[in-house]
Amino acid sequence: HETPFTRENPFGLPPTEAVPFEPYVLPKANNNILFLTDIHFPYHDTTALTLALNYGKEKNVNTIYLNGDIMDCYKASFHEQDAKKRDMSHELEQCRNFLDILKREFPKAKIFFKEGNHEMRWERFLRVKAPIVLGMEEFELSTLLKLGEKGVTFIRNKQLVKAGKLNIIHGNEYKGGGGINVARTL
C-alpha cells in the first residue's frame, strides 16, 4: 500500500523501522567512577585488576563502569580454538563471581556493564549455531550473568554512553579503525 504524503514526508517514503538514536546518560549522582575495560576473563591480569580495585576503594567510588570485553567469550568465537581451553560456562562463572566481588567490596556503588565486541561473540554464536533460541531471554548474556538479579545495568554495544560531558565508547565502536589502536588515532 502507498504511504500518504504529509508535510513531514512530502515524497511518500515508506515508514522507517529505525529507532531514534539516544545516548545512555549516566545519572549525575554517578560522578565518582571506576572505569574497568578489557578484563577478558579468564585471561585477566590479577595484579592490574587488584591495583584498579584498590584505587577504587581508596577513592570511594560510587559507580563502577565495566566498559566491555569483561569476558573473552573464547568458546563463542569463530577463530580457531584450542579444545583444551576453558569453556563458556567457566567464563560465565568467573564473570558472575567478579560481579559478586564488586558488589561485596563496593556495596553502595552502582554498576554498569557495557557489552563489548567479545561479549557480542555470544549473540553472533547463537545467530549462526542456534538461531532458534536467539532473542529468548533465558539465553541472553545479561540473563546468563544474572545482571538483573545483581542490580547491574546492562548497556548494549554501539550505544553511546555519556557521563556529564564525557562520551564513553568501547574500542570497537570507534569508527577510525579497529579497537586495538584507537588511542593512536584520537
Go through the PLM ranges and name each one.
Residues 1-35:
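Acidic, histidine-bearing metal-coordination/catalytic regions of metal-dependent phosphoesterases
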Residues 14-19, 46-50, 169-182:
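Short, motif-level signal for alpha-helix interfacial/capping segments enriched in acidic residues
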Residues 22-24, 54-55, 102, 180-185:
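Short, flexible, glycine/charge-rich loop motifs used to bind or transfer phosphoryl groups or to couple energy/partner
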Residues 28-30, 60, 107, 164:
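Residue-level preference for short coil/turn positions at secondary-structure junctions
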Residues 31-33, 63-65, 166:
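Structural motif
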Residues 36, 41-149:
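Core catalytic region of metal-dependent phosphoesterases/phosphodiesterases
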Residues 123-186:
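Acidic, His/Gly-enriched loop-helix segments that form or flank divalent-metal centers
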